[in-house]
Amino acid sequence: MQKILIANRGEIAVRIIDSCRAMNIRSVAVYSDEDRNALHVRHADEAVYIGESAVEKSYLNGNSILNAALNCKADGIHPGYGFLSENAQFARDVAQAKLTWIGPSAESMESMASKIEARKLALEHQVPVVPGVVLAADAVPDLEKIGSLGLPLLLKASAGGGGIGMREIHKVEDLDSAIAQGRSQAQRQFGDGSLLIERLLSGARHVEVQVIGDLHSHLLHLHERDCSLQRRRQKLIEEAPAPGLSDDLRKQLQSAALRLAGAVDYHSVGTGGFLVQGDTFFLLEMNTRLQVE
């Protein structure tokens, strides 16, 4: 590739521009009204205006970004993280425009975007999952089956992420209202009212494994990190390597992350997230993007 458009701003855009420069690839920044004098704009070889300050009219405007890439004759688009980085349809649009999407395939993203689909894939590839019940958007909840998981429970929006769409359930009598509220919120915020109800693993550690794959089905892990120190399910500090894990458990986590990535023919950088309790672990999710940290 000779020229890459970076569909992002801030630190990540600057870092991608630096990498392009080191590889003798021309970089194209994009900007909105409020970003026209930002560092990433001044740092890039070229810069293109993509819309008004509201992100819906600029950094989340796939058509504007795609047109900018075509007009400046870029060879590919790097989404960075956030914004359109996990938008499978945008990735598909980029590929259909005969440009290179610098990220995982649309199919990989779609498979992992749904916690329910990710759970199904995990079970098929011997990756442990937390005991739970899948609840389709229009399904009548089997309260007896859900209650048999034991309390407390954690209700998750299937299409949610970043800690959004989660609620704890500590009383059986709260199940009905929690499910109704959870479905309503999930449908409103994510367009999908499907839920996943799992046993809440109190005190479990949050450990992630970074993976990277190429277009020839080669996959590697870049070891693990502990992300347990959080506020409102948002990570504050990460520590690598994760302390206090046995060598055997460390290898099991790394192997599970690679199996999950291989299940969707993953290429690009991604992250397998796991809950670790004692010597056991369970899949949490897979992030199909460059890790923010």
What are these regions (language model features)?
Residues 1-272, 276-293:
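N-terminal beta-alpha lobe that positions the nucleotide/phosphoryl donor
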